[in-house]
Amino acid sequence: MNDNKKLGVIALAGVVISAMLGGGVYNLPQNMAQSASAGAILISWIITGIGIWFIANTFRILAAARPDATTGIYTYGELGFGKFTGFLMAWGYWICNSFANVGYAVLLMDSLNYFFPPYFKGGNNWLSIACGSLVLWIIFFIVLAGVKQASALNVIGTIGKLLPLAIFLLVLLFSFRFSTFFTDFWGLKTVAKVHDTNLGGILPQVKSTMLVTLWVFTGIEGAVVVSGRAKSQKDVSKATFLGFITCLLIYTLLSLLPLGVYSQGEISKMAPPSTAAVLMDLIGNWGSVIMNLGVIIAILSSWLIWTVMLSELPFAAAQSGTFPKIFAKENKNESPSFSLLASTIIMQIILILVHFAGNAWNMMLSITSVMALPCYLVSTLYLFKITYKNENYPTDIFAKRKYAMITAILGSIYGVWLIYAAGINYMLIAIVIYALGIPVFIKARRETSPNEKEFTKVERYFAIVLIILALIGLVYLFKFM
């Protein structure tokens, strides 16, 4: 690839930050305060920050230890555990983010309803579907023009989404009162005048926020996913660190500073996006306008970068023979043209179906969301494998082997916790979607290696187990329906 078309540390950090900071962050104060006090929220961010650090650090170490393993999440799966595992990582990531991107379309239209009521109410009426489809194909052509150009536009979008958050935090900083913040700090009292109620013990409060804190870091792998287009793998490591620190700081301040201006009870009852409700109360209607514009910019920026990311993995998998060959096509701008087109067509079909889906859409979004989580676990397990067996682990990088092994062990424990916290039932149903990819893998293997068996002996047993679990998942799916 032409070096001029490769991504530097700023563009890569923009990918990470934009992938994590979606429109949902603008309702974080209410989400966190719904059933937790300031003290519990603080503990929750400390626990999550430590856990996610081991995931982020895994990506940093692997980028340095295996600079040849570009398009990380997919490649780590294949190098560590074979082509079938690598395929499942690419397939799962691709499908789940196709659904997630359609979620951005619905959220964008619903956000536009603030400025143009009631035309886009709910985000899934026919006008919303039409306008969402228009944005979907505009993003397709932007990415088709080149990943470098899309990433440059994303840097502008990232700045655009950070500015409203900076205004919000600055206003709150000057309005912050320690006396308010420490009133019922642990949520163990009932204070009627500020709408506070006894929230129960500290542990239940922390647990109630953990699901929120887990999901807001989805996208930490952003720089790794597009690492095949990075100028340097060192830049991938730096970008992951910058993205993690920036988002952790923003999330913590967004959750805690409002509790120095309003009580937990007051914030928990605010309408989404709660940042708009807070700023409107403090500086008037302009505050609400600023934050709602921020939501729209955040959605567009995240939608753009997730489109880049979800088209990369099938492209990389096709290059190594675990996706059909046609997905390896690039255009003159070195954009993964067929992978991008296939992704956009899938998203278009899903977007049309959203109009009819109702509650089924929310359930499907929850199911597909958990499909990204095994990618984290496979990455930490791969790091453990190369450090434990000392498989050519380099001695000249920033992380010594023992340090990397500790990171891998703790990251793996946290990865298992992520899957457990997401819900075993949802994971079982998600396995149905994983199993649907098996024919695609078989087709790809027959195309690239017609004289070899599609599966190794271990992979064959793994595929059988996957199919059995998928059948169990179907039972759960029919129960939910």
From Swiss-Prot:
Keyword hit for ATP-binding: no
Keyword field: Amino-acid transport, Cell membrane, Membrane, Transmembrane, Transmembrane helix, Transport
GO biological process, one term: amino acid transport
Transmembrane feature ranges: 7-27, 36-56, 87-107, 127-147, 156-176, 208-228, 241-261, 289-309, 338-358, 364-384, 401-421, 422-442, 461-481
Predominant cellular place of this UniProt entry's protein: membrane
GO CC annotation: plasma membrane
Classification via Pfam families: AA_permease_2
Gene Ontology molecular-function annotations: transmembrane transporter activity
InterPro entries the UniProt entry points to: AA/rel_permease1, Amino_acid_antiprt, APC_superfamily
Topological category with respect to the lipid bilayer: Multi-pass membrane protein
Subcellular localization(s) per the UniProt record: Cell membrane
Signal sequence, renumbered to the chain: none
Family to which this protein belongs: Belongs to the amino acid-polyamine-organocation (APC) superfamily. Basic amino acid/polyamine antiporter (APA) (TC 2.A.3.2) family.
NCBIfam families named in the record: 2A0302
Biological function: Could be an amino acid transporter.
Protein name per Swiss-Prot or TrEMBL: Putative amino-acid transporter CPE0389
Lineage of origin: Bacteria, Bacillati, Bacillota, Clostridia, Eubacteriales
